[in-house]
């Protein structure tokens, strides 16, 4: 056996393979490394109208769903808007997403955004119908807290807006043991 022949890998080959291995991390998409990938078509970008306790509670529920992104919140109370933005920003950082959450005093401005897919309506009860109708007319999916409306006319107007807008509108309904029929 020749003296200059060595077993194993040469330093030059080791450095070349190491550089190739490290370069592969810049080529691979991040989802292939961490195992999580949500297609853009599977993401739902939410906007919240009404940032009181119910809106924050609903955010907590929605935040546990994969593919949910929160883009904006709206409330007439500036303190609630600021609290919401802080909470969303902290959640986005925890998720490894660049923090960005816009806040609005007037919901009509938020409804003009094309990047928002769905709206959560958690306003005081007497605003549910109007905000839901406007959100449907803006082409947004809507999740509305109960009660949906105070009058049959409001309810019918909401249905018409949902059908005309071609988007689903859902609402909260609690289920308890007393709601069950039979066993």
What do these predicted regions represent?
Residues 73, 146-148, 172-175:
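Short strand-turn motif at the edge of the Rossmann-like AdoMet-binding core
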Residues 177-183:
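Oxidoreductase and adenylate-handling cofactor-binding alpha/beta cores
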Residues 2-141, 153-168:
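N-terminal glycine-/serine-/threonine-rich beta1-alpha1-beta2 phosphate-ribose binding loop
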